[in-house]
Design a protein with these regions (language model features):
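Active-site neighborhood of phospho(di)ester-bond hydrolases with catalytic His/Asp-centered motifs
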Residues: 207-209
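Alpha/beta enzyme core
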Residues: 6-12, 16, 26-52, 59-77, ...
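Short acidic/histidine-rich active-site segments
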Residues: 211-215, 233
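Basic/polar N-terminal segments that are highly enriched at the extreme N-terminus
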Residues: 1-4
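Conserved phosphate/anionic-ligand binding catalytic regions in large, soluble enzymes, centered on
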Residues: 23
Length: 245
């Protein structure tokens, strides 16, 4: 197969009404696990790392990662998760990432637009796709992906304006999920009506669901049917991995 930019992969997902799993890795074991599981299921895959994970593995790791992904038996993407600065994104691009996320969601709306525009300008010049975020994802525990204590839901009326002004390729939206492991007894509930409103206004824009761990399978399924084309998963499978060490 080949190492694609995410725009190419999510375009197919959008046209065929499915979502691609995106899995955070922080070492060669998790990288191997994610790729081999995707191959065993004949499923496309997005391998992603947040900046703290990039720091942990070091730049030399990405020669291995890009080579393995180029030779994967399924379509694959190497994606930067929750880059906070232009420098985060440039480092990823130089290391062979085919997609980057610039997360300016905690900035003002106009500052977020300006930051996203700058990253889009740089990334698109070298055929790298860009994910951005409006609204804020929650955080249930310390996580490399970040998050905030109080979720700010994405405003549907802002999505079309943000997309047109930035030229982004995909958008992470906040509809009630959180990064990390949910406390025992806590049952998250997605605001699917917010997703419906966003999808109605921007039907061609690939939408991304962060904090996918521990949500009900049926809710995730419904979200995918209603316009989500990328689902981020980290905490669930990391918990299973570390429980066996």
């Amino acid at each position: 197969m080949m190492l694609l930019n995410m725009n190419e992969l999510l375009k197919v997902a959008k046209e065929n009404h499915f979502a691609v799993g995106a899995f955070n890795v922080c070492d060669s074991v998790l990288l191997k696990t994610v790729i081999e599981t995707a191959e065993a299921n004949n499923a496309p895959v997005i391998v992603e790392l947040a900046p703290p994970e990039v720091d942990f593995v070091g730049d030399e790791f990405f020669q291995l990662a890009t080579e393995r992904l180029r030779n994967a038996k399924v379509p694959a993407v190497l994606h930067l998760d929750h880059g906070k600065t232009v420098e985060d994104c440039v480092r990823a691009i130089r290391n062979g990432f085919t997609s980057v996320m610039i997360d300016g969601s905690e900035l003002s709306y106009e500052e977020n637009i300006a930051l996203t525009q700058r990253v889009v300008e740089i990334a698109h010049a070298v055929n790298v796709s860009v994910e951005a975020e409006i609204g804020t994802i929650g955080a249930m525990s310390d996580s490399v992906e970040g998050g905030v204590e109080n979720i700010t839901y994405t405003k549907p009326e802002e999505v079309e304006d943000f997309s047109q002004r930035t030229g982004l390729d995909s958008l992470a939206i906040a509809i009630g999920t959180a990064h990390g492991i949910y406390p025992t007894g806590f049952v998250p509930e997605l605001k699917l009506e917010v997703l419906d409103a966003i999808h109605q206004l921007t039907p061609d824009l690939p939408l991304v669901l962060h904090g996918g761990s521990s949500n009900k399978d049926e809710e995730i399924h419904q979200a995918c049917l209603r316009g989500i084309n990328k689902v981020n998963i980290a905490s669930d499978y990391r918990k299973a991995f570390f429980s066996q060490l």
